[in-house]
UniProtKB/Swiss-Prot annotation:
Its EC number is 2.3.2.23. E2 ubiquitin-conjugating enzyme that accepts ubiquitin from the ubiquitin-activating enzyme E1 and transfers it to a E3 ubiquitin-protein ligase. In association with the E3 enzyme BRE1 and LGE1, it plays a role in transcription regulation by catalyzing the monoubiquitination of histone H2B to form H2BK123ub1. H2BK123ub1 gives a specific tag for epigenetic transcriptional activation, elongation by RNA polymerase II, telomeric silencing, and is also a prerequisite for H3K4me and H3K79me formation. The keyword Transcription regulation applies. Present with 2770 molecules/cell in log phase SD medium. Residues 151-172 have a biased composition (Acidic residues). PROSITE patterns: UBC_1, UBC_2. This is Ubiquitin-conjugating enzyme E2 2. It catalyses: S-ubiquitinyl-[E1 ubiquitin-activating enzyme]-L-cysteine + [E2 ubiquitin-conjugating enzyme]-L-cysteine = [E1 ubiquitin-activating enzyme]-L-cysteine + S-ubiquitinyl-[E2 ubiquitin-conjugating enzyme]-L-cysteine. Residues 4-150 form the UBC core domain. Induction: Up-regulated by UV radiations and during meiosis. SUPFAM superfamilies: UBC-like. The N-terminus is blocked.
Amino acid sequence: MSTPARRRLMRDFKRMKEDAPPGVSASPLPDNVMVWNAMIIGPADTPYEDGTFRLLLEFDEEYPNKPPHVKFLSEMFHPNVYANGEICLDILQNRWTPTYDVASILTSIQSLFNDPNPASPANVEAATLFKDHKSQYVKRVKETVEKSWEDDMDDMDDDDDDDDDDDDDEAD
């Protein structure tokens, strides 16, 4: 069924395929255009550099008049990210406008890596370390970057394991 939200999401997907902003990628699930997987690569010259951070975007039929629900699936240590992965970002709440699309949502989240807002913390510990103990903050962030790589390797191992299982079945 084609609805305004679904048509808009297909346009957003086309834009992401043809002209994705640097360091971000996203696509809908194969069987549900209303749910997207996304990834943000940590920007250069930040403690998040080269991290691979996975996100989930869930849209409803009111999109683009209402923002999607967005959360990190990857572990994240950031002043504006709650422990459950939800993001404290004004455009995902009271400053949302229908002109935002998937690309602009992801680039706005990516900009938080460059410019955290410790004045409006979702993670008080991260905000305090960011303001008062920058070296400890950077150390914690780098640990999450390394964890993001391990998670990616685990995902690849899981894929390999699936292939191995198929080979085992054929050998029997």
